[in-house]
Structure formats: C-alpha cells, structure tokens
C-alpha cells in the first residue's frame, strides 16, 4: 500500500466524527421530526447563551444538544428567526420564554445531568393561543414543539419551567358569538375570542382559527325554536312578496309619468330616489326567499370544511353577498334621501313664510297659473337635482358599504337566514347600522320639527288677518299641509324610528340572550326590524300609487258622465251647458249648477227686455247671472254660430232667450255660477278646438260658460 493512500485513510478516520456532527446539524428538520429524543450525554457541559433573543430571559447558560435535537447555537438562532413574526404578533406573553426554553434549555452546574426545558402546561398555554394564528397563515404547529414531549409537572425527578403565567387578562366585554378570554387582534372589538366555552350552547358553535370567531352551525337552534323560525319565515315572506308587487306597479307608474303634468307625476318625480332604493331593498328580501334559507345563509368555511355553518363571512356566497348589498346599501341610501327631502321641505316652508318674505306668498305649487308653477320649482326638486346633494346621498352609504366589506362583517341571522351587517357581531350592529341610521333620523327629524314650527307660525299669521283673500290663502295652505309631502315625511320618520328602536334593543340585549342559553328569546324586535324595513318601501309605493289610482278613477267617471250628457244633447239639438265635473266645486259662495233645458229656437220673435244682469267676479274667476226663478235658460241658433269666445262674452245679453212659464210679476233672483274645472272634458275641448266651442271661455285656470 502506498504511503499516500495510508495518509488519506487516516485523515478520513480522524474527520469522521466531525462529518457526522455537521451532517446532523445541517439537517435539523430530520432530527426534529423524529419521534425519539436525541441521545443526551450523562454529564452536560454548560455554555453561555449567544443568541440575542434569549438573552435576559431569566438564565444565562445552556447546553447542547437542545431538547429538539439541535447541537449548535448558530442553527438554533436561524430556527428562532422563523418565529419572529409570531413573536411580533404577540399571541401569547409566554411565547418567547417557551421557545427559548425548548431551543435553548437552561443549564446549571447543580443539575448537570438533564437540561431544564418547558413544562407541558407552558407548552399547552402557548399552543392554545398561537396555534390558530399559525393556521391563519397556513402553517401547522411544529412537530418539534409537541407538548407531549415535555414533562407534565416540575418536581425533583423531572425539572422544568412552568412560566409566570399569561399577562393578558380575560376580556370582560365580548363580541357577539364570542366569549371572555384571551383573544387575537382584529375586528371592531379590539381582540376577538379564541374559544366558544363562554357561550351557553358552545357545542353548537365551531371556532374559526383564522378569525377567532365562533360560527354557529347552520341548523342550530340557539335563540329560537324551529316553530318560531317557521312563523317568522311566513310572516316576513308574505310582506316581502306584497311589497314586491307594489314595487312593480309603482315602478311602472314612475316610468309612465315621466314628462306628465299630473299631480301623481309630481309625486313620482319627487319620491323617485326613495322608490328606487326601496325597490332594491324589496328585491333583496325576495332573493332571500326565492333562493331559500340554506342557499343564502349556510355554507362551509375553509378552516372547517366538514361543517355546514351559518355564514359569518358572506362575501364568498354570491346569494348572501347580493342580499346584503341590496338591503344594506340601498336601505342606507333611502334613509339619506329621506333626510334630504326633509331638508328640502323645511327650506320650502321657510322660503314662503311671512318672516322671510315680509308678506304671505302661497308656494308656486299650491296655486297660480301653470306657467308660474312650471317656472318656480320647489325646494325638494331643487335638492334632488343638485349634484352635490346627489353625491352625498349616494356616496355616504357607499362609504359605509365599503367599510363593511373591508371589515368582512357580512353575516346571516339565525331567525330568517337573511344576510346583513351585525347579525353575529353586536359591535358591528352598533357602529355600522344603528349609528348611521340614528344620524340620518336625527337630521331629518330636526328639519321636520323646524319646518312644522314655521308652518304653524304662518297659519297663525294668516288666521289673525281679516282679508278674505288671505283667508282663502289659509284654506289653500291648510289643504296643502294635510296632503303634502310633509305628512309623508312624518309617517316615514315614524317607521324609521320604529326600525331604529328594534336595532338598539337587539344589540343591547343580545349578550344576555346568548349567555342565558334560554330559547325564550323575544321575537318582536327581530320581526319588527324586518317588518319596518319592508313597511318603509310600502309607504313610498302606496303614496305614489294613491294619486295615480285616484286620477284614473276620476277620469273614468268623468268620461262616463260626458258620454251620457253628449247623447242627451244630440237627441235634442241644443246643449246649454256641460256638467262633466270631475270633482267638488263648492269653493265659491254662489250655487254651482248645470243647465240642460233645451228650448226651440225663436229667432224670429223679438227678444223681451233682458231679465238678468251679467256680473263678473275678477277675484274668484267666475261669471254670475242674476236670473228670475221662473225662467229657463236657452241658447239661440244665432248665438251658436259665433266663433270667437271674446265676441260671445261681449254679446251674451242679446242672444239669450228667457221664456216665462208662470206668473211674471213675482221675481225672485238666484245667483248661479257656471264653470268647468281644469282637466274636465269641456276644458280639454276648448284648449284643442276653441273656435268650435264659442260658448266656452278660458278664464285663468278654469273653463267658464
């Protein structure tokens, strides 16, 4: 054998122990993953701790190999650096002590045989708090830190470190579906609970490690019995489908009234933002009942794939997300638009008050000519068409919805299975639902109260006036107040207050209901909340449909009467007056009558002296005839051949014939005013063919005979 070969063999033999040690230290995972602990020498040699993280931990010396198999402090330092994010997360105040005790165990000359590591209680305390955080990041609990490897207790046979205990005290204020105890950061409540043992029916919950929240099982009966859930399903679904039907009819009327000048069209245009918002809210409820409870409210979570849970993060469920979006965003937008309309009504009342004008001016939509009514818009219409107001009314609810999505507080409720905000988080219900609704309601209510006070002052000023025209203005103002938008806004505000009351009562008592474990939870706040949410839309739809149905009914009645009167006039050849009145005309002091007596023309007979006198009342827009009681009014053929209403008015005394029936010496006069209201058949005919109806006159807003 050559000397060089012998030399190489000696070098390999001498270096063999170091190669084995380096290979072992270079693959710590293999040694740490082995189930059997490493061989520990009978007497250990203590060395100073050189790892920065474990200095000033409570002891200064350690020995290698450690309890997880590492033989060099440099390898241990590299391994501990991988736990730095978990340490910064501060899931447990004892985490650093536990890691140092496991990877850099304490060594003392008084006990040179065994390294002193952590006790099992210290390991389990840290594992309970930090394992969910690791799972949230997608990492399992390290096998090298299995708590079963460590001593159960500290005694004279097995020495270990028990730790000082957790510094964080259990939380007293808990989130809905949470419990007192140590939590992880996140959510509106600061720290979310880590287990579900604080709940009365904890076996019906599954704790989600990533979020730390407790999700109830899909079919769990925690607060309500199955019979109560069935009753609530029938009650709310009935109102939801009724509201959906009204919403469809109101939408058709809204689209059909575009450009119309009827009163119903004015209401539709003014309330169009509220109508569209409540259309979407009603559609959201309809989607919930059409898809079903399971399809909307139940699902699986990646952290618990084997359980069907009530949704706590509804953004992953398309049906749940759509129901939430339509209910929450458009519901908040409806509250914002109601507040805007209250502000507009207040401005409109104050703008026409005597205090601001120095005299009484009836608003343009109360009376006056059509040109004036079209040229002067109300304050509500001005606000609904203002770009800044539209941006605020649509933008604030959008900001709220974005906050809910970022915080991931979209969840389903147990009773109805409808997705919303705060069903499983009382803090979210308080901050993201009750607070904004309360702000909108306070703003709108203050404007309503202020406008009502101004309106009462205006009525008092008018009531103290003796002028007849002012008294008539008072009647018009009172009529507008009883049927105007102020009444609607007041009714809407009451319904909104009931909704707010139900929300406040729910988040104020939900902790008591969950902690008691009693299924006798009151139904009324939950049913009232859902009912009022739908009733707000029903009020809007009914308020728009009311004038439309009334106008349609009056038009049908008016057309039927006109056809009947026209047939009677064609049979006799003379029509002395049209009486197709569409409403009550008792607004004047004189008696309103219609004449249908038909007389044969007597053009060849000289006319007797006129027994009546034509009087015009410019203040009321009417023509009065002082007529003897035993005379009937007829119209000559010569008069019907006139083509100018002005000419007819000028020569009216010469072309009327009066035929006495009885004694001419007893003359009793009665004042009669003949007119046709705006919108009647005769008024429409005059506006279309004025030259062919010379016996009709257009006076202001009325068609007069």
From Swiss-Prot:
GO MF entries: G protein-coupled receptor activity; transmembrane signaling receptor activity; Wnt-protein binding
Domain of life the protein comes from: Eukaryota
SUPFAM superfamilies recorded: Frizzled cysteine-rich domain
Sequence ranges assigned to domain FZ in this UniProt record: 41-163
Topology Extracellular: residue spans: 23-233, 292-322, 408-430, 505-529
Listed transmembrane segments: 234-254, 271-291, 323-343, 387-407, 431-451, 484-504, 530-550
Residues bearing attached sugar chains per UniProt: 60, 306, 317, 423
Chain intervals with Basic residues compositional bias: 636-670
Compartmental location: Membrane
Cleavable signal peptide: 1-22
Keyword Signal appears in the UniProt entry: yes
A cellular-component GO term for this protein: membrane
Ranges per topology, Cytoplasmic: 255-270, 344-386, 452-483, 551-705
Alphabetic keyword roster: Developmental protein, Disulfide bond, G-protein coupled receptor, Glycoprotein, Membrane, Receptor, Signal, Transducer, Transmembrane, Transmembrane helix, Wnt signaling pathway
Topology versus the membrane: Multi-pass membrane protein
InterPro entries (UniProt xref): Frizzled-4/Mom-5_7TM (IPR047105), Frizzled/SFRP (IPR015526), Frizzled/Smoothened_7TM (IPR000539), Frizzled_dom (IPR020067), Frizzled_dom_sf (IPR036790), FZ4_CRD (IPR041765), GPCR_2-like_7TM (IPR017981)
GO biological process, one term: non-canonical Wnt signaling pathway
SMART domains on file: FRI, Frizzled
Motif PDZ-binding: positions: 703-705
Cystine connections: 46-107, 54-100, 91-130, 119-160, 123-147
Domain topic, free-text comment: The FZ domain is involved in binding with Wnt ligands.
Family membership noted in the UniProt record: Belongs to the G-protein coupled receptor Fz/Smo family.
Job description of the protein: Receptor for Wnt proteins. Most of frizzled receptors are coupled to the beta-catenin canonical signaling pathway, which leads to the activation of disheveled proteins, inhibition of GSK-3 kinase, nuclear accumulation of beta-catenin and activation of Wnt target genes. A second signaling pathway involving PKC and calcium fluxes has been seen for some family members, but it is not yet clear if it represents a distinct pathway or if it can be integrated in the canonical pathway, as PKC seems to be required for Wnt-mediated inactivation of GSK-3 kinase.
Name of the protein described by the UniProt record: Frizzled-4
Organism: Drosophila melanogaster
Gene: fz4
